[in-house]
């Protein structure tokens, strides 16, 4: 390709704009009313509950006390003795405070210095440490370690960086989250599907032309690498492009979304029509969503009250069009096709993890009543 890409590490970390266009009120995801504690990663990635359950189990089965265990490790450090893998693993699960984490950091440095040349196939401590920091709200400690040159190679997996970026995103620390993303790229850690979601969400929250350029760079590099960018990630870029009045860019990205039938895509499409001045087509979309021939089991399109307010504002100078809109709006309201959630809240809401249902199905192989194996036909039903 003839296009020259700017390396991501050379891009300046942009300061977030205080007046995003799409979100209206500019409400942050941590004020989202959808009831989720995290707003980007699903439970099967963060695994916080699983981590906490394991902490309880390890503490219960520990021979002796936590204080004795910690004292033995401190002696090993002062006597320059070898740190074993199981010792570090147990230590991470026993930590309950910032003081405990300080000891864990010292042990991590020693362990990595002793084992950095033997990382292939080794146990990944990075995600465990990040879950510990997530639980204790110690994002500063996590950022310090991932950016420390002496620990290069310790955080080799995308999950560690993803959990840290999610932690920073949830707390509204978007600039620091972008710095972690840049560090991840500089360390040549392979991006996962979740990484692209986080990266584009961070750029969307920064809400600057510079952050939009970062999205463009990442999309082009993903194309070269053959990485797949999911619909949810693309939606953040479309919203950002619309915020910055980059309509052509927004339309181009939206056209790449496969099956744009989600509630977020439906509302982004309405905003694209508003900025394109395609008012007749816009009203046709709203009217078609009222199709009375649809089965009650088919999910109808749902529109954000915030987005519909923008439609009304756009149509206010045309009495004929505003009359049509008011009629459609009333019917949408009666049908329950209007949500009070803003587009920002819808973008940041974590979709339900489908894999958890599959795991339950796999686990349920024996009848609770007869204690006999369930038949294949029953499982398929």
Swiss-Prot record:
Location(s) in or outside the cell: Mitochondrion
Description of the deletion phenotype: Deficient mice shown deficiency of the third complex of the respiratory chain that caused profound ultrastructural changes in the heart. The outer layers of ventricular cardiomyocytes appeared to be infiltrated with macrovesicular fat deposits, having the appearance of adipocytes.
Tissues showing expression: High expression in heart and liver and low expression in kidney, brain and testis.
Keywords: Mitochondrion, mRNA processing, Phosphoprotein
InterPro entries found in the cross-reference section: mS27/PTCD2, Pentatricopeptide_rpt, PTCD2, TPR-like_helical_dom_sf
GO biological process: one example: mitochondrion organization
Pfam families noted in UniProt: MRP-S27 (PF10037)
GO cellular component labels: mitochondrion
PANTHER family named among the record's database cross-references: PENTATRICOPEPTIDE REPEAT-CONTAINING PROTEIN 2, MITOCHONDRIAL
Protein name (Swiss-Prot/TrEMBL): Pentatricopeptide repeat-containing protein 2, mitochondrial
Annotated source species: Mus musculus (Mouse)
